[in-house]
Amino acid sequence: MTTERSSEISSPYAAQPAATSAAAPATTSESKPFDLDTVKKVRTVHLAQAKATGQKFSMLTCYDALTAQIFDRAGIDMLLVGDSAANVVLGYESTLTITLDEMIPLVAAVSRGASRAMVVADLPFGSYEQSPQQAVASAVRLMKEGGAHAVKIEADASMAEWVRALVRTGIPVVAHVGFTPQSEHALGGFRVQGRGDASERVREDAVALAEAGAFCVLMEMVTTQTAQLVDEAVGAVPTIGIGASNATTGQVLVWQDMMGVRTGRVPRFVKQFAQVGQVMEDAARAYREQVRSGEFPAAEHTF
C-alpha cells in the first residue's frame, strides 16, 4: 500500500459541492469561508471541513452532564466518553475493567449535557473483539441507549472489516491506532509507538481503517514523524492526537490530567492548564473548617 495511493483517501463525510443549475443566475454572492467556531452543532462533515481549511479542533474526555455543559460553553468541539472512566471515575486500576453496561450511563449523561459538541463513545475492552457483529451490537447500544454520535474503536489493519460493518450500519467511527491502551499487555506496557520501521505499520493501520470508512483517525503516543506520515497518508480524513505532536488536525486529553485534578506523575504529553484539584481540596478544607467552627451556615444562608 503506497503513500501515493493512500494520500487520495477522501472522507465520506466531507461536504459535497452543490449541483450547478442551468437556471441559476450568472452571478452569485460568495459564500462565507468555513469557520468551525460558528458551527452550532459539530458533525462529521465539519471536522472534514476543518482539515480541508487548515483549522484545528479540540477534544476532551467527559463523563457527566455538568462537565459536558462547561466544556460546551468553552467551545470544545468533541467530547470523548473514554474507557479512561475506569480510572478517573470508577477507581479501577486498568481501563480493561470497565464494561459496556458501565459505559452507557456515562455516555447518556454526557449526551444530555452537551448541545454543540460531538459526543464520541469508546467501545470498551471485551465489547467488540469477537466479531464485527459484536462490535455493531455494542455500538448500537452506545448510540441508542447512550445517545452517542460516534464510537471509537482501538484497531489495526486486520480489523478493517469491523469498521466497514459499523459504517454500513450508519455508525460514524473514530479509529484509534498507535498505542492502544486496551492492548497494553501485548504491546509491552505504555510505550511510544512508531519508532523507526514501526512507523510504516502505524501508517498502514491508519490507511486501512480510513479506507474502511472511519471518519477520523486518533493516534496515541506516536513519534512526530509517524504522526506526520499518517496525517498525510489518510488524505482528507481528519486526525486526532494524544501524545502525537501538533501534526494532527485535532488534539485530545483526559480532562482530569490537563486540569490538574489527578495527583502524581502525569504523562509527558500532558500540559496542565490549571490546578483544579488543589482548588477543590482548598474549598473542601475551608468548608470543613467553617462547619466545625459553626461559622457556616451563617445568617444569610438560613431562612
What is each PLM-predicted segment?
Residues 2-53, 57-303:
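Alpha/beta enzyme core
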